[in-house]
């Protein structure tokens, strides 16, 4: 397969690159950290195409995306992991607007460009990584929880839009994962990255429309959705 992972230099995206780049696929990776991307390209040179890109810069993303399509020809699977999350109890406006710029504006441009590419191809599998945090207001990170609620509903809209086409859309909705984005002391139910990555790979292989990972977070997801 020809695969693109957006937000691949750490966390879930990096774990997915490790799997797919060692499974006979050609994997394009995008991220902000050039040093990490260079290491990835050197580690699996025959299976990795790297492109430095910050999705908040929509023009830069469009150029990088067109370059990737030119390199790979077609895209079979695109996984969008890019995003930021900062604790912001003081409501620092720079933090709030930066979060919106990445998780809403940049993310939407990214998703839209991928979906249009799949429409041109007549097929493709889009995977978004949202968060259980999008189901409940978060006083210490209001912009983050609001942005994840946006992503959840945008993904649902694309799932409805893609019915009857060759495009399939999967939403991955994790709880707290042991990555750079999990911030704070004594975090509740933090999940090991390798366990989460394996579950995501299975869901993608089976083309599940949605995965709430792991099981304990599925219970919390149900409670938040129906009783909060």
Model regions and ranges:
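Conserved glycine-rich cofactor-binding loop
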Residues: 9-10
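Short alpha-helical oligomerization interface
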Residues: 88-101
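Active-site helix of classical SDR
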Residues: 111, 147
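Conserved NAD(P)H cofactor-binding loop of Rossmann-fold oxidoreductase domains
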Residues: 81-87
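C-terminal helical subdomain
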Residues: 171, 183-222
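Residue(s) in the substrate-gating loop at a strand-loop-helix junction
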Residues: 131
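Conserved glycine-rich Rossmann-like NAD(P)H-binding loop of the short-chain dehydrogenase/reductase
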Residues: 25-40
């Amino acid at each position: 397969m020809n695969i693109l992972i957006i937000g691949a230099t750490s966390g879930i995206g990096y774990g997915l690159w490790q799997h797919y780049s060692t499974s006979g696929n050609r994997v394009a990776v995008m991220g902000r950290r050039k040093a990490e991307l260079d290491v990835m390209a050197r580690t699996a040179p025959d299976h990795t195409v790297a492109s430095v890109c910050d999705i908040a810069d929509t023009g830069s993303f469009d150029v990088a995306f067109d370059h990737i399509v030119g390199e790979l020809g077609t895209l079979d699977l695109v996984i969008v992991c890019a995003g930021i999350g900062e604790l912001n109890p003081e409501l620092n406006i720079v933090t709030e607007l930066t979060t919106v710029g990445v998780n809403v504006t940049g993310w939407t441009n990214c998703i839209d460009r991928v979906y249009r590419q799949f429409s041109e191809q007549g097929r493709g599998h889009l995977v978004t990584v949202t968060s259980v945090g999008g189901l409940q207001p978060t006083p210490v990170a209001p912009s983050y929880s609001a942005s994840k609620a946006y992503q959840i509903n945008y993904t649902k809209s694309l799932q409805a839009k893609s019915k009857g086409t060759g495009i399939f859309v999967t939403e991955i909705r994790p709880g707290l994962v042991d990555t750079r984005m999990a911030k704070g002391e004594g975090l509740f139910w933090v999940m090991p990255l390798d366990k989460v990555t394996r579950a995501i790979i299975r869901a993608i292989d089976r083309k599940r429309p949605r995965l709430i990972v792991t099981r304990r977070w599925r219970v919390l997801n149900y409670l938040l959705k129906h009783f909060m």
